[in-house]
Structure formats: structure tokens, C-alpha cells
């Protein structure tokens, strides 16, 4: 009935917006296509790379205290965990031709359910224009930018995110209950 997304792009809006700036932000997607090397390097020193990603890209250091970073590192250090994480990006290329025909059709169908897109306006991985271009593909869309938040908006600004979610769910439930 409703959809809530935090800093996750609609793929058509992502493709439409893709230019040099987004390419530079998405370099890691291409790096992850190399077999075994990314997970090997990311796993060195107890998955220190995972900690560095969160430490260097968040805008509110208190959201990622050392004990939270350690949980991410421990989880990433488990057997097969880094490969699974990186395979998310590798899957973009596998089966693309078979899926492309179906996706192309589906990606042009508008999303018609009430949707809330919460977006940190200082995301280092995704251009803000991707969020604004999502209106082309979602007919009932509310975009809420959180100033000074990064890609990790739900960790950095959880109070604001929770309030936005509560307001959205309450409002859309009220509208759904109104007689037509």
C-alpha cells in the first residue's frame, strides 16, 4: 500500500541522471566487477576497509561510534560475508540481457502507490538529482531532503527519519480512510 525508501534510487532515475559526476561517485561498482580481489583487499586487517567507509562518508560521527563500527567489521569478517556484499554490485551485469527486456518494460511503468523518499542531501555515493528525477517514475511521491545528512541518513538522523515515516504513514492512512 505504501513505500518508504532511504537514499535508494529508482533505477530509471539513476540511469537518466548518470553523468560524469555520478560516474565518479560510482567508481566502486566497476571495481567490484573484478573477481575475488575486492573482497580480498576489503577483508585485510579485520575488514578495516569497511570501517573506513563508514568513518569517512558519514556526516555525524556520533552515529557510528567505535562499538558500532566493530559490529560492521565483525559481520564483514564472517566467512563469505564480503563476497555476498560485493556480489550485490556484481549482479548488475549477470543475466542483464535476459532481464533487460522485462525490466525495460517494468521500469517504464509508473509506481502508483504512495511513496516517501528520504534523502540525505550530502550523499557521497548518489547525486541529489536522482532523487528529484524520481518524480518521473513515481506518481504519488514525497521527497524529503535531510540537510547535512549522508548516504547513511537513517543512522545519522534517526529521529528525523522516524518522524518523517510516522507523519507519512499517518497521513496516507488518513487519506486512505476518507470516503471517495
Regions found by a protein language model. Give the residues of each.
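Flexible "cap/lid" subdomain of the alpha/beta-hydrolase fold that forms the substrate-access gate
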Residues: 1-145, 166, 171-173
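Catalytic active-site module of serine/aspartate enzymes centered on a nucleophile-bearing elbow/loop
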Residues: 140-180
Amino acid at each position: 500500500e505504501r513505500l518508504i525508501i532511504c537514499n535508494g534510487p529508482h533505477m530509471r532515475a539513476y540511469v537518466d541522471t548518470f553523468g560524469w559526476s555520478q560516474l565518479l561517485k560510482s567508481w566502486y561498482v566497476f571495481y567490484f566487477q573484478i573477481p575475488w580481489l575486492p573482497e580480498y583487499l576489503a577483508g585485510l586487517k579485520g575488514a578495516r576497509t569497511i570501517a573506513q567507509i563508514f568513518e569517512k562518508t558519514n556526516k555525524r560521527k556520533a552515529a557510528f561510534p567505535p562499538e558500532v563500527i566493530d559490529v560492521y567489521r565483525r559481520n564483514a569478517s564472517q566467512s563469505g560475508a564480503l563476497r555476498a556484499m560485493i556480489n550485490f554490485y556484481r549482479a548488475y551485469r549477470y543475466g542483464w540481457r535476459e532481464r533487460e527486456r522485462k525490466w525495460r518494460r517494468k521500469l517504464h511503468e509508473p509506481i502508483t502507490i504512495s511513496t516517501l523518499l528520504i534523502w540525505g542531501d550530502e550523499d557521497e555515493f548518489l547525486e541529489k538529482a536522482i532523487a528529484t528525477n524520481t518524480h518521473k517514475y513515481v506518481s504519488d511521491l514525497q521527497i524529503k531532503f535531510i540537510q547535512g545528512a549522508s548516504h547513511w541518513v537513517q543512522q545519522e538522523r534517526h529521529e528525523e527519519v522516524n518522524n518523517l515515516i510516522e507523519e507519512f504513514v499517518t497521513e496516507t492512512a488518513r487519506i486512505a480512510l476518507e470516503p471517495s
